[in-house]
Amino acid sequence: MPEWYPLLVGHTSKTLVLESNSDFSQALAGLEWPGYFIKDYVKSLNMGSGSLVDKPQEIAPLVKLMLQYRGQIEGGICVRRREDYLEGTEQRYFVFQGQAYSPNAKIPELVTACAQVIDSPFFSIDLALRADGELRVIELGDGQVSDRKEWGAERFVEMLARRQ
């Protein structure tokens, strides 16, 4: 995340990257964000109450759970300003060799813009509509795809079979 965030800062949630042993209350003092989404450089916590917390003092216990369940923290802790997204609007796209792909052939302009600024041969882009209707980047994946989400296997293989 620290690599792509500066390139897409205007299209994603505000984010601070901190050490895993930080005093989160002190580091986040004065921000007054409506909540926080917590992840390390690679992944969020997908069990229990998840990675959403309301107060900075809830972050350290969440980081401890991440460490317990995953065995390590990858890089630092990404503290993201919680944004409200419209339910059911998150969708995954892929970029392969600079070309953007969609599971349904409709590719938002934001995906194409990401494909132009991210220098990687293969990555995923998760987008969702924020409550105000703005399309936002939720996450970029570095090719270590854990799930195709709404992509059928045939469509995914079709994308990978294309060579430029």
PLM regions with names:
Residues 1-113, 162-164:
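Active-site nucleotide/adenylate-binding loops and adjacent lid/helix of ATP-dependent enzymes
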Residues 99, 106-164:
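ATP-dependent carboxylate activation and anion-phosphoryl transfer catalytic cores
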